[in-house]
Swiss-Prot record:
Gene: cutA
Cofactor note: Binds 1 copper ion per subunit.
Pfam families for the chain: CutA1
Record organism: Citrobacter koseri (strain ATCC BAA-895 / CDC 4225-83 / SGSC4696)
Binding site for Cu cation: C19, H86, H87
GO biological process: response to metal ion
UniProt keyword Cytoplasm, yes or no: yes
Family recorded in the similarity comment: Belongs to the CutA family.
Name the record gives this protein: Divalent-cation tolerance protein CutA
Assembly and oligomerization: Homotrimer.
Protein task: Involved in resistance toward heavy metals.
Amino acid sequence: MLDDNSQDISIPEAVVVLCTAPDEATAQDLAAKVLAEKLAACATLLPGATSLYYWEGKLEQEYEVQMILKTTVSHQQALLECLKSHHPYQTPELLVLPVTHGDTDYLSWLNASLR
């Protein structure tokens, strides 16, 4: 049973976008850009991440800043395009996760912030 401040949502169809950046300055710049263009309502930057991955056949290990961006389905494509066009990586991490449940007040704020 849901309490009064949470709901299963179809509107505003919130999504979370994950993106990594090579350093805090780049993450700040990307976040400022998408927030100024109202493509995301909130950007949470988590410095201190270490990513391990194979690139061109070689195991890489890099310090990165994990970005968590909150937006809606109707803004996600423009957000992804903006991040990709301004990102220093050839192939940036761009993952979209659906939000299946959330606080009504927060989701209302998120939706209003993108107008």
